[in-house]
Amino acid sequence: MAAPPASSSAREEFVYLAKLAEQAERYEEMVEFMEKVAEAVDKDELTVEERNLLSVAYKNVIGARRASWRIISSIEQKEESRGNDDHVTTIRDYRSKIESELSKICDGILKLLDTRLVPASANGDSKVFYLKMKGDYHRYLAEFKTGQERKDAAEHTLTAYKAAQDIANAELAPTHPIRLGLALNFSVFYYEILNSPDRACNLAKQAFDEAIAELDTLGEESYKDSTLIMQLLRDNLTLWTSDMQDESPEEIKEAAAPKPAEEQKEI
């Protein structure tokens, strides 16, 4: 990676540092650098490169903790089934620590989205990008929150995804990677959080079918990204329809919890 020019602005310097942090897999610092970029642009929009760097930074920071939470929750269930109450108490305390970290990360990006990124977005793809991101981080909260907090997080997720979907359907082609990525994550939300496999499958299938119908219009630039997400949509559809065939409608309706999050494909 070449050194930044000596005359580079603070904004360019932080972008460069974020790229260095990404290469070094120091994602917490990458988040800090990209937050500084967002502060430096004031009311202007981030460039496509900058918003992608911000997304990658937060996705890695949150992704590590989501994976940790799933592992600890799985261990907790096993210890509960064995009646190891002392271990369960220790595990719950540890899970609570991870949940505090998850909450802090989500609160940080959601505040940035609400105060800067969403209000500054001027075109269709950036609006959908940020509203999808807003939905994603509310969804991550809904994964581990309980009671009213979970209900609130789910409602915020639905509101953000629907707002993004309205703009995407009006302004982005069915093959646009951002529109496809929204459909992918929105369908995962229906399946995992709202426990609605029918709606999840309908949304994923519609997005896939609409994109297939216009596949020949795809430019070389976005072909790889779009077809990758289409494959993920198809993977989820295969998994979900298989699950639904294994259960009667009554069992699906009354199911207390969805399949583990790691089985679903999202971006």
From Swiss-Prot:
Subcellular compartments: Nucleus; Cytoplasm
Chain positions found as N-acetylalanine: 2
Coiled-coil regions, chain positions: none
Entry annotated with the keyword Methyltransferase: no
Chief localization: nucleus
UniProt KW Zinc-finger keyword: no
Residue ranges of the region described as Disordered: 244-267
Function of the molecule: Is associated with a DNA binding complex that binds to the G box, a well-characterized cis-acting DNA regulatory element found in plant genes.
Protein's name according to its UniProt entry: 14-3-3-like protein GF14 phi
UniProt organism field: Arabidopsis thaliana
Origin organism lineage: Eukaryota, Viridiplantae, Streptophyta, Embryophyta, Tracheophyta
Gene this protein is translated from: GRF4
